[in-house]
Amino acid sequence: MTISNQSQVLLSANELTCIREERILFDGLSFNINAGDIVQIEGPNGAGKTSLLRIIAGLSRPYAGEVEYSGENINRCRDEFNHDLLYLGHLAGVKSELTAEENLNFNLRISGYDDFDTTAILAKVNLTGFEEALAGHLSAGQHRRTALARLQHSNCKIWILDEPFTAIDKKGVEELEQLFIQHAESGGCVILTTHQDMSIISDAMLRKITLDYRFV
């Protein structure tokens, strides 16, 4: 399975094979992800979508093959790659004992940012008035928006997002889609999984990688 384009290549997957619990989830998977791409990883449950995202992000190792960033194996340019990577997993990664503002402040500071307005950023994800609320007291949608708020203040080229629309209402999904488009138009890329339909990002704007697992 190969997906390619002639734009500036940010990421390359070369002959990736992933095996989990004696199942081949994908084998010999190769593709390029370019500046300006919005890429959806799709497939049935258990096909390896999250596994592929984690391999691309360098959080898991493939059984075979490699991922390159700007032509170099990500394990040999780890600092540069991590500097340009924003990864949000299926779990929100929000600490329930911290407020929404404290969570955002923590996540941005460990990402190397020191000049930002948390109140303004949280307002962009409709959390005005909830800045001081403990994350553990927020609704599922507010909890997810707290995690996604860091997208509003990110210089990372590569966004890898596992089910970013979970617990987000229709208006929130549309706002995220617009943000993804802006990021792609500025020269970044977005790689995501989702079970929800997108209404702003058209099929013509979206590239897809389809996975289908098989047993060894």
From Swiss-Prot:
Family: Belongs to the ABC transporter superfamily. CcmA exporter (TC 3.A.1.107) family.
Reaction(s) catalysed by this chain's protein: heme b(in) + ATP + H2O = heme b(out) + ADP + phosphate + H(+)
Main location: membrane
GO molecular function, one term: ATP hydrolysis activity
GO biological process: cytochrome complex assembly
Leading EC class: translocase
Keyword Membrane: yes
Protein name as it appears in the record: Cytochrome c biogenesis ATP-binding export protein CcmA
Keyword terms, alphabetized: ATP-binding, Cell inner membrane, Cell membrane, Cytochrome c-type biogenesis, Membrane, Nucleotide-binding, Translocase, Transport
Membrane topology type: Peripheral membrane protein
The EC number(s) this enzyme carries: 7.6.2.5
Pfam name, any one: ABC_tran
